[in-house]
């Protein structure tokens, strides 16, 4: 994936991770996963609930935060 493809993904996922926002992740096959984003990279998201699951990004359809989250796509901060 190009760097441009990460301009929205990374800040959004990072804000969810840093603010410990609960999320619902819908997979392309319709399965709903819930938990908190523990970490992510170019290919996977680590989702923590009672256990930590490695979810491949190509299997994700939608990420729905449980509450609104502020993120800034133009600035990367760790």
UniProtKB/Swiss-Prot annotation:
The protein's organism comes out as: Paraburkholderia phymatum (strain DSM 17167 / CIP 108236 / LMG 21445 / STM815)
What is this protein's name?
RNA-binding protein Hfq
Question: What lineage is this protein's organism placed in?
Answer: Bacteria, Pseudomonadati, Pseudomonadota, Betaproteobacteria, Burkholderiales
Q: Does the keyword RNA-binding apply?
A: yes
Domain of life, per UniProt, equals Bacteria
Q: Which GO terms describe its cellular component?
A: cytosol
UniProt keyword terms in alphabetical order: RNA-binding, Stress response
GO BP annotations listed: regulation of DNA-templated transcription; regulation of RNA stability; regulation of translation, ncRNA-mediated
- Disulfide pairs here are none
User: Into which family does the record put it?
Assistant: Belongs to the Hfq family.
Annotated Sm domain residues:
10-69
**PROSITE patterns, per this entry?**
SM
Q: Which Pfam families match?
A: Hfq
Q: Which residues form the signal peptide?
A: none
Q: What does this protein do?
A: RNA chaperone that binds small regulatory RNA (sRNAs) and mRNAs to facilitate mRNA translational regulation in response to envelope stress, environmental stress and changes in metabolite concentrations. Also binds with high specificity to tRNAs.
A GO MF label: RNA binding
On whether RNA-binding is a keyword of this UniProt record, the answer is yes
**How is the subunit organization of this protein annotated in UniProt?**
Homohexamer.
């Amino acid at each position: 994936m190009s760097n441009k493809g990460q301009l929205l993904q990374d800040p959004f996922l990072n804000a969810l991770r840093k603010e410990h926002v609960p999320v619902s992740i819908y997979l392309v096959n319709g399965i709903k996963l819930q938990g908190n984003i523990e970490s992510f990279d170019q290919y996977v998201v680590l989702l923590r609930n009672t256990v930590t699951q490695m979810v491949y990004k190509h299997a994700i359809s939608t990420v729905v935060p449980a509450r609104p989250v502020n993120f800034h796509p133009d600035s990367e901060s760790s």
